[in-house]
Curated annotation (Swiss-Prot):
It comes from Mus musculus (Mouse). This is Myb/SANT-like DNA-binding domain-containing protein 4. Residues 4-77 form the Myb-like domain. The keyword Chloroplast does not apply. One of its GO terms (cellular component) is nucleus. Pfam families: Myb_DNA-bind_5. The modification Phosphoserine is found at S106. The modification Phosphothreonine is found at T188. Residues 202-344 form a coiled coil. Keywords: Coiled coil, Isopeptide bond, Phosphoprotein, Ubl conjugation. Residues 139-175 are annotated as: Disordered. There is a cross-link at K9, K114, K142, K237, K254, K273 (Glycyl lysine isopeptide (Lys-Gly) (interchain with G-Cter in SUMO2)). The keyword Coiled coil applies.
């Protein structure tokens, strides 16, 4: 059995915690790197060891290791989350008009919040009591004298994955950069109060309402435009119907004039051949005249049928045109109905 020696170390002082956070700020690109490979892990271990050396350089009497400063940082982060949640609960308990959904969102954001730091190098650490509270969470460190080397790569990678799993930025929120956290509850950096964010959901709701109102107005304008288009098509339909009637009237007039012209032609032919009729016998005259009249009648009937055929063809073409316009209007009406159903709240 290997013996475990327990050595009680003193808590981190305010100066050590201040130095710890400053050094993490300088190396946040390495510590909070999204990549997880051997090279990055080695760089992270080196960064934590450098931070431990800077903390030890403060001269408080304790020699901190990279693992200890990592644990100290995680304790500090956990304390910040607890204070944030307590502050939110106090707001609700005091009757502050914070909706339940806003409280849940704020707590969720605090749980998933990535710890980062301000770029300001001049820190003013005023709330010393909070540092002492945070320091109390790290009261004892076990030093195991076993064959397994704490500085081995396997140990460091395992410890790093265990302790920094909630610190490394999540891929779901990779667009967020690890900037400085809101640590007003831990210590006071300035006396300017932060702007309350409880009205952000109401602001988003108002923006969505305005968007829906604008979309509704646009749909109303589109409906009016379709109504005007429908009326225009109706007027066009009436105009085409009048044109058809006019065309038919002109066609009938043309047929009447054609018949009149044939009538006058027959009369002219009958007056130009009196001598021929006198020379021919009475039998030939009676036989020739009915044949000519019958031929002219057949010719006129043939022309009339051709004109009627052309007129029916024209009417068929116009009917197909109106049917296409009717179908297009029906499709447009159906599209507008579907669009309204999709945008109404």
């Amino acid at each position: 059995m290997k013996q475990l020696k327990r050595k009680r170390k003193s808590n981190f002082s305010v100066q050590e915690t201040q130095t710890l956070l400053k050094e993490i700020t300088k190396r946040k690109e390495v510590i909070f790197s999204k990549q997880l490979n051997t090279t990055i892990n080695v760089m992270k271990r080196m960064a934590w060891e450098e931070i431990a050396q800077c903390v030890n350089a403060v001269g408080e009497g304790e020699q901190r290791t990279g693992t200890e400063v990592k644990r100290r940082y995680l304790d500090w982060r956990a304390l910040m989350k607890r204070k944030r949640m307590k502050a939110n609960m106090k707001l609700v308990g005091s009757g502050f008009p914070l909706p339940t959904s806003d409280l849940d969102d704020s707590l969720t954001e605090d749980i998933d919040e990535k710890i980062a730091f301000r770029n300001d190098a001049n820190f003013e650490w005023q709330n010393v009591a909070d540092f002492r509270d945070a320091g109390g969470s790290l009261t004892e460190v076990k030093v195991e004298e076993e064959e397994r080397d704490p500085q081995s790569p396997e140990f460091e990678i395992e410890e790093e994955e265990e302790m920094l799993s909630s610190v490394i930025p999540d891929s779901r929120r990779e667009n967020e950069l690890p900037d400085f956290p809101h640590i007003d509850e831990f210590f006071t950096l300035n006396s300017t109060p932060s702007r309350p964010t409880y009205d952000e959901p109401h602001l988003l709701m108002n923006i969505e309402k305005q968007k829906l109102e604008l979309e509704k107005r646009r749909l109303d304008i589109e409906a009016e435009r379709l109504q005007v288009e429908k009326e225009r098509l109706q007027i066009e339909k009436e105009r085409l119907r009048h044109l058809d009637l006019e065309h038919e009237r002109l066609q009938l007039e043309k047929e009447r004039l054609q018949i009149e012209r044939e009538k006058w032609r027959l009369q002219l032919v009958s007056t130009e051949k009196p001598a021929l009729e006198n020379e021919l016998g009475q039998g030939e005259k009676s036989m020739l005249q009915p044949q000519d009249i019958e031929a002219e009648k057949l010719k006129l009937e043939r022309e009339r049928l051709q004109l009627e055929k052309d007129r029916l063809q024209f009417l068929k073409f116009e009917s197909e045109k109106l049917q296409i316009e009717k179908e297009r209007l029906q499709v447009e009406k159906e599209r507008l109905r579907i669009q309204k159903e999709g945008h109404l709240p």
